[in-house]
Amino acid sequence: MMADLSIEFAGIKSPNPFWLASAPPTDKAYNVVRAYQAGWGGVVWKTLGEDPAAVNVSSRYSAHFGPNRQVQGINNIELITDRSLEINLREIAQVKKDWPDRALIVSLMVPCVEESWKYILPLVEATGADGIELNFGCPHGMPERGMGAAVGQVPEYVEMVTRWCKTHCSLPVIVKLTPNITDIRQSARAPPPPGPPPGGGVKNKKNKNTRARGRGPPPGGAPDPP
């Protein structure tokens, strides 16, 4: 008899605690279905936003190398979804219908304007999704537009947007904060009563690859000589 790995998190049930975070592998139905078929208990759908969709660049990944070309970390410059809101919502509804026992959270990022949140929240809720994730952590591309980490770094904004979401949506609200802040506890304490929603501490952390000896990035990602 197999062990029971089922969980309940923020009122969301899942057959196991192994979920995929919002990222390129969760950006469309094809990828999410493959994850479910492989046994993943839940996914956070790649961040949705307002139309028109963001325009991503390629390549979106780079590696940080150590001695002997060992990969020590992966950096990405991916923005939010580059597909239309309509297509994403349609696929989310179909996937949830086909896989009702799996957790499906929808990551969201729209401007700090209440009407923008008031518009998108009912559309997401109508898909049958289990909850929403507020992306207050993206450190590249979106903060320049007043979203992502630009929100997570201001506790008053975190409180304001979370309150809007709890007002205009009945789904569980998960707040994903940015680590690119002096004291993350200030933002974590910001969500309004009746108690803070679950919060994920880390999105992406800003970094750059530099040589230990000398200055500037190593050519071609090469490590320092011995």
Label for each model-derived stretch:
Residues 1-105, 109-114, 118:
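N-terminal capping/small domains of soluble enzymes
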Residues 33-38, 111-211, 226:
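Alpha/beta enzyme core
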Residues 197, 217-218:
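Intrinsically disordered, low-complexity proline-rich tandem-repeat tracts
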Residues 214:
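Short polybasic linear motifs
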Residues 219-225:
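Short, intrinsically disordered C-terminal tails of secreted or membrane-associated proteins
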